[in-house]
Design a protein with these regions (language model features):
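Acidic-basic catalytic patches of nuclease active cores, encompassing PD-(D/E)XK
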Residues: 1-26, 40
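Structural signal for conserved beta-strand scaffold positions within catalytic alpha/beta enzyme cores
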Residues: 23, 48, 76-78
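Beta-rich catalytic cores
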Residues: 31
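Conserved catalytic cores of phosphodiester-cleaving nucleases, focusing on short active-site segments
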Residues: 35-37, 43-53
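Short strand-connecting beta-turns/loops that link adjacent beta-strands
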Residues: 40-42, 81-82
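Mg2+/Mn2+-dependent nuclease catalytic core
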Residues: 53-71
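Nucleic-acid nuclease catalytic cores
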Residues: 68-96
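Charged phosphate-binding loop/patch that engages nucleotide di/tri-phosphates or the phosphate backbone
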Residues: 99-102
């Protein structure tokens, strides 16, 4: 059975056909986001996918460092397995997300 994050990835890919996605399977560079997106305007951006049951979002120190170092064109997309559904955070808000949760 696929992990919740894998299911989230497949769902995102299905509902955003206008975005060209590259799934980054990177074990060599810790903290690198899960996805590289390319939109119709020719802009690249990264997305870290997270699935959570509670208010807190589990982010590694490497993921936090990546978003602090790359605050623009980077995002964290969080799927809450409950009534809050999906929220998108800019990479520049990483410390707020860590401190306050959803």
């Amino acid at each position: 059975m696929p992990k919740p994050e894998t299911k989230f990835w497949h769902e995102l890919k299905r509902i955003t056909p206008q975005i060209k996605w590259t799934r980054i399977e990177n074990t060599g560079s810790f903290g690198t986001p899960d996805l590289l997106g390319y939109n119709a305007n020719g802009h690249f951006f990264t997305v870290e996918l997270k699935v959570t049951r509670g208010n807190s979002v589990r982010l590694s120190p490497h993921q936090i460092a990546f978003h602090k170092l790359h605050p623009k064109n980077s995002f964290i997309l969080v799927k809450h397995l409950g009534p809050r559904a999906v929220k998108l955070y800019e990479g520049s808000r990483i410390m707020e997300l860590v401190a306050c949760g959803l």
